[in-house]
């Protein structure tokens, strides 16, 4: 289970799958994603089950990007990794995305 940002950066590598449990855009909740690129600046992810999806097609096929923020913008609780647009208020109002790392790969 990921407990901090350093562990998350080591865990999210190409091929890692995760499920979105909360998002600033509610239509993305429940979506299963697969990391295509991860580096020191952030990570890109696609929806492997939907090759024509706008998330998958974004950034020339690398997928949607989430840039790493500093540690105070993150919260790690009960296997859920959450990033917020505030380093002080970790509430739904400031949520960018929450997700859990999946044990098995998605398609």
Where do the protein language model's features map onto the residues?
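Structured surface patches comprising rigid loops and adjacent beta-strands/short helices at the edges
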Residues: 74, 97-104
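Acidic, low-complexity, intrinsically disordered interaction modules
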Residues: 24-31, 36-95
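Mixed-charge, Lys/Arg-rich low-complexity intrinsically disordered regions
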Residues: 1-14
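Generic hydrophobic/packing signal
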Residues: 16-18, 33, 98
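Tryptophan-anchored aromatic micro-motifs
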Residues: 12-23
